[in-house]
Amino acid sequence: MRVHTCPVRFYYEQKEALSESDRYTICKQLSYHLGKSLNAEEIWNEVMTVRPAVDPSLRDFLGICISACSKTAWKPAVQTDVRVASDKHGIAGMIDRIDENGMFSIIRASGAMPFGTYAADRLRIAAVALCLEEMTGNIVEGGNIEYIPDGVSRFHAVQPRDRRQLIATQHKLREIRAGGMPQHPLNAPCKQCKYQEKCESSVGKRLSELL
């Protein structure tokens, strides 16, 4: 999904080891308790087991998440961390939660938009839907995006534009892996990017031209 956000950043990051943030660890661990009593002490102990070096000050962040999530009626999960894959499309991923009705959810450690969902999250839902359709043989209408810090769950119905964007993203990925240096999108988040100088000096060239 990082290709969709900014393919140039993905180009530079593709050989770097990825690690989840402390905030994500907290939100992810809390998600296992949704639909049940949210005990801050219990969840924090689990967080420290999963991530011993977690920033202690983020205990307050956990409290904020619990307060927000306590205002929403959640369905407990019957399955968690379910791997999905599509051989046809060459994609794979993980579903965070599946409820008793078969509805799937992905967990986000960011706040929710006032309305709707982020483009990258819509793409995640579309990718999971494609995987599930291939695995089950059934049409998948969409899935939930659960913004833990705000205690918000939003259903996104997959649209044709989501599937088109997913196909375009796959094309970008193949080009990058073939050695191409992609163009950055017009709305790329350049100001917060650590690769901004590299991007401005080399965008549009192929890897062979940079060596």
Where in this protein do the model-derived segments appear?
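Well-ordered beta-strand positions in beta-sheet-rich domains
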Residues: A92-M94, R122, F155
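Short amphipathic alpha-helical face segments that pack within enzyme cores
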Residues: L123-C131
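Short beta-strand-loop-alpha-helix junction that forms the active-site gateway
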Residues: I107-T117
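Short, conserved loop/turn and helix-capping segments at secondary-structure boundaries
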Residues: Y118-L123, P160
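Glycine- and acidic-rich phosphate- and metal-coordinating loops
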Residues: F104-R108, N144-E146
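Metal-dependent nuclease catalytic regions and adjoining charged, substrate-binding loops involved
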Residues: K75-G90, F115, E134-L211
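Active-site catalytic microenvironments for nucleophilic, acid-base chemistry
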Residues: A17, C131-M135
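Metal-dependent nuclease catalytic cores that hydrolyze phosphodiester bonds in DNA/RNA
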Residues: M1-I98, M103, L211
